[in-house]
C-alpha cells in the first residue's frame, strides 16, 4: 500500500525545514503552498515534496481537499506544518495500512503552548482523524473546522502526534485574530444578529461557562500559567468573534449609508 502525506501551508518555512526531513519514509509528500512569501514553496521543493500552489483561502478545508486530489497514494495522512510524528509512527502506520478493514484511523494529539504540553483543560487527548483511504473520506468545504467525513469503520492508532501551534504569545495573538475573524464570518453567514439575547450569550454566558469548564472542571489550572492563558483566551474567543460580527454588520453598505450624517441644508 502506498502512503501520501499531504500538507498545506502559508509562510511556514521554519516548520517545514524541521518537519519534512522526518517524513522520508512516506511514498510521497504533497505540499500545497498558499501564497507564502518566506520561501516555503522553494524549501518544500528542495526537500523532495511534490509542490503545488493555491490561493490562500481562509477556509482551509478547500486547500486540504485540493492536496488530497493531487495525492497518488492509496492512503492519505494529512499533517499540519506545526505537527510532528514521532519515530514510532512509521512502523505503526506501515503495519496498519497493510492489513486492515478500516477506512480511517484516529490518533491522540499533544498540544504544546509556548513549549509546554497541556495535559488538562480539554487539551488532551485532542483526538484527530488523519489517516484514511483516499477513496473513503473527504473534507467538507463549508467550514474551516469541519472534520473529515469517512465512509467506513474507523480504528485508533496507539502513538500520539505532537502539535506546536504557538511558540510565543505574539504568534498566538496573530492566529487568534485570524480565526476569530473567520468564525465571525460564519456567524454572519448563519444568520446570527446583534440582539440583547445574543449579546448576553456571547459576552457573558458562553465565556463564563467555557472558562469554568476548561479551567476548573477539566483541570486546566493543573497546567500552570500556560493553562490559565489558554483557558482565558478560549473564553475570550466568544467575545472577540461577536464584536467582529458587530463590526461586519455595521460596515455593510446599507448600514454605512444609514449611519452617514445627513447633509445640512443650505442657508
State what each model feature region is.
Residues 61-68, 75, 86-252, 267:
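Catalytic-site signature of metal-activated, phosphate-bearing donor transferases
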Residues 2-4:
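Cell-envelope/extracellular polymer assembly enzymes that use nucleotide-activated donors
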Residues 34, 56, 73, 80-83, ...:
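Short acidic donor-binding/metal-coordinating loop in glycosyltransferase active sites
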